[in-house]
């Protein structure tokens, strides 16, 4: 007589039930990217390539940043539907199939993924991307507006509560209408980046925040009004009454306008993080070719206007990164001296908060990764050291390569009086393939 188990099942039934249970458990914990890749249908080959090669990295970022499984699915499906089919050709080895130059990455690429590390908080994953169509840059769509409009509409459909009050304000005050730009074709031809806006997303649990960047270069070229004047006037026209915000704005304007504020004018831009006047955060971007650590200190402090413990703590991090990424980093590429600077104007502090982006696209990835480990270790963020190392191995395969480039485009550093230091790494998913 055949024995049965406690539930009255025969041995073969028991084995089948156990195998089924194991499969169910395995399916429950299978990575969202793997599950979706088995199911999704792609519109064309480039859609598939952007999914397999870029979304796979985004999936690793989300998982290692400890986003919930539900949020991982949500953000991956957003990338699949809004971005992956509309990012244009996946770049070939020579990159000669890419016809549109974007201002997001140092090499003109149109997708960037970043990981923000900060004290006592979950990591934040961000993406910046410019969707394109075959007509971008041609007479039919010289400023790549068709793809941008579709992207905004798609994001609004996914998250209808997106607030465009300040979006419309800065569009009106910083940019020029398409018809005006078209009537000044000869002037516009001298501006290297033809897009007047770029967009990024801060990914959070169950939602995203749209971050739009408005570049005044085309308006400046047409009107003859300096970029800095355009940007500061656009902010003042918001009529914000917060005393801290007004103080910070005046301090930055006092330093930036007389010196023309920058030496690489096409990197100028303005963005905002919130539309609530009580929580307003506006950022002003510029590019400066740096000469020395003393030059960096002068810019960090706005010529001595910014002082205090928080400024000094922030510059200590700048100096440590400068030593590794500038003084000791062996590349001789001019690019590493081209640094992006950002000042954040907030309602909770009375001075502009500086942020420096080190340009590291020409540096070898293992070297940059080791530098990030050193600064995270110096800050005592042991758990984030492990997160970063896992990210480099799993998303960028640094553990299996001898050399690779463009796992990093930038490393940024800032120090907030309330939340402390922030370290952010920026990577280009469509960069050169690793050298094994």
Swiss-Prot record:
InterPro entries cross-referenced by the UniProt entry: Aro_prenylTrfase, Aro_prenylTrfase_DMATS, DMATS-type_fun
Residues bound to dimethylallyl diphosphate: 126, 211, 213, 283, 285, 357, 422, 426
Annotated keywords: Alkaloid metabolism, Aminopeptidase, Hydrolase, Prenyltransferase, Protease, Transferase
Basic and acidic residues composition-biased segments: 1-12
Location of the region described as Disordered in the Swiss-Prot/TrEMBL record: 1-24
Catalytic activity: fumigaclavine A + dimethylallyl diphosphate = fumigaclavine C + diphosphate; an N-terminal L-tryptophanyl-L-alpha-aminoacyl-[peptide] + H2O = an N-terminal L-alpha-aminoacyl-[peptide] + L-tryptophan
GO MF terms held by the record: aminopeptidase activity; dimethylallyltranstransferase activity; peptidase activity; prenyltransferase activity; protein homodimerization activity; transferase activity, transferring alkyl or aryl (other than methyl) groups
Induction record: The expression of the ergot alkaloid synthesis cluster which leads to the synthesis of fumigaclavines is positively regulated by the brlA and stuA transcription factors.
EC number per UniProt: 2.5.1.100, 3.4.11.17
Gene Ontology BP annotations: alkaloid biosynthetic process; ergot alkaloid biosynthetic process; fumigaclavine C biosynthetic process; proteolysis
Pathway(s) served: Alkaloid biosynthesis; ergot alkaloid biosynthesis
Documented applications: Ergot alkaloids are known for their toxic effects on humans who consume contaminated grains or livestock that graze on grasses harboring ergot alkaloid-producing fungi. Due to their strong affinity for monoamine neurotransmitter receptors they may also have clinical uses such as treatment of migraines, Parkinson's disease and cerebrovascular insufficiency.
Family: Belongs to the tryptophan dimethylallyltransferase family.
Assembly, per entry: Homodimer.
Family annotation (NCBIfam families): arom_pren_DMATS
Function: Fumigaclavine A dimethylallyltransferase; part of the gene cluster that mediates the biosynthesis of fumiclavanine C, a fungal ergot alkaloid. DmaW catalyzes the first step of ergot alkaloid biosynthesis by condensing dimethylallyl diphosphate (DMAP) and tryptophan to form 4-dimethylallyl-L-tryptophan. EasL also shows tryptophan aminopeptidase activity with preference for linear peptides containing a tryptophanyl moiety at the N-terminus.
The name this protein goes by in its record: Fumigaclavine A dimethylallyltransferase easL
């Amino acid at each position: 007589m055949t024995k049965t188990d406690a539930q009255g099942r025969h041995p073969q039934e028991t084995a089948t039930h156990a195998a089924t249970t194991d499969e169910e458990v395995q399916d429950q914990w299978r990575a969202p990217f793997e599950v979706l890749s088995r199911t999704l249908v792609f519109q064309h080959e480039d859609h598939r390539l952007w999914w397999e090669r870029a979304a796979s990295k985004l999936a690793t970022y989300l998982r290692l940043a400890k986003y919930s499984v539900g949020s991982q699915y949500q953000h991956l499906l957003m990338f699949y539907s809004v971005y992956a089919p509309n990012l244009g050709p996946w770049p070939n080895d020579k990159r000669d199939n890419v016809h549109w130059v974007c201002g997001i990455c140092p090499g003109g690429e149109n997708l960037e993924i970043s990981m923000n590390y900060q004290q006592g908080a979950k990591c934040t994953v961000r993406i910046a991307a410019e969707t394109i169509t075959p007509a971008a840059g041609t007479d039919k769509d010289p400023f790549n507006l068709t793809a941008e409009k579709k992207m905004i509409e798609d994001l609004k459909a996914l998250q209808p509560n997106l607030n465009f009050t300040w979006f419309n304000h800065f569009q009106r005050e910083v940019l020029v209408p398409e018809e005006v730009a078209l009537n000044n074709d000869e002037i516009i031809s001298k501006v290297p980046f033809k897009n007047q806006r770029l967009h990024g997303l801060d990914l959070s649990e169950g939602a995203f925040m749209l971050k739009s960047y408005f570049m005044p270069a085309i308006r400046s070229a047409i009107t003859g009004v300096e970029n800095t004047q355009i940007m500061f006037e656009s902010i003042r026209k918001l009529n914000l009454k917060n005393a801290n915000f007004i103080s910070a704005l005046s301090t930055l304007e006092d330093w930036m306008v007389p010196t023309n504020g920058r030496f690489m004018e096409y990197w100028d831009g303005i963005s905002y993080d919130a539309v609530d006047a009580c929580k307003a955060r506006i950022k002003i971007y510029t590019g400066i070719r740096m000469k020395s650590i003393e030059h960096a200190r002068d810019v960090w402090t706005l010529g001595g206007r910014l002082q205090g413990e928080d400024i000094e703590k922030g510059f200590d991090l700048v100096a440590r990164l400068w030593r590794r990424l500038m003084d000791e980093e062996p590349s001789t590429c001019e690019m590493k001296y081209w640094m992006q600077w950002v000042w954040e104007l907030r309602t909770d502090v009375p001075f502009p908060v500086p942020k420096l982006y080190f340009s590291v696209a020409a540096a070898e990835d293992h070297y940059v990764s080791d530098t990030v480990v050193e600064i995270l270790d110096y800050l005592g963020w042991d758990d984030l050291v492990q997160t970063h190392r896992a990210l480099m191995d799993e998303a960028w395969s640094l553990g299996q390569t001898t050399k690779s480039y463009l796992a990093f485009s930038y490393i940024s550093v800032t120090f907030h009086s309330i939340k402390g230091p922030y370290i952010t790494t920026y990577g280009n998913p469509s960069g050169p393939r690793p050298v094994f």
